[in-house]
């Protein structure tokens, strides 16, 4: 039987993290790994009281590197798959159930997509990034994802640490390595507490658009997928 863990990167989510953990525990027996990205509130303490495995960052490293911390922990503990979801309550247990119920066992990555969310501007940006990058993914920024062991090994590597977000760069890397990806439709909820790490200010939005645009145009540059894949797997196994 496949060993699955849930990874939740979190920063200053004390208002929502208890409800998120309780909701998941009511539906699943999977270990819940909360990576506390140097929160200044009680996120860590609340997650610990709710029985989650808490991996604390001393410094704020961002949501993607927090996710990497969870991936490395899961690999070291022998998990075959992980589900990543947000700490703000956007991904209810029902969405995780939909993701698991519709996931294809042969895919290295399964994305829980919700095209109903997001503003018109965000949808326009998605279409532009899809065109520039060549990615055939509808919901580029969804944090609700199922990663199988091959994708986990690649994305836990030092080479993948260059990314700032769990979207275009991650998808491009897996695509370059010929890893299969699929999407399933899920229902998500609106964020009720906290602030978005990307959309909390115009400066952050512009920085994200520039960063993602450059990644999309570059497509991570030319390299031999199989050779790079073996290098990443070897590096991940040695860490």
What are the residue ranges of the model-derived segments?
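C-terminal, flexible cofactor-proximal segment of oxidoreductases
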Residues: 200-202
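Conserved C-terminal "switch" segment of AAA+ ATPases
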Residues: 134-135
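Glycine/proline-rich active-site loop of Rossmann-fold NAD(P)-dependent oxidoreductases
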Residues: 193
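Membrane-proximal helix-turn-helix segments that form the acceptor-binding/catalytic region
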Residues: 128
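Structured catalytic core of nucleotide-sugar glycosyltransferases
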Residues: 1-123, 131, 147-157, 165-188, ...
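Activation loop
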Residues: 124-125, 143
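Short glycine- and hydrophobic/aromatic-rich loop-to-beta-strand nucleating segment
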Residues: 138-147
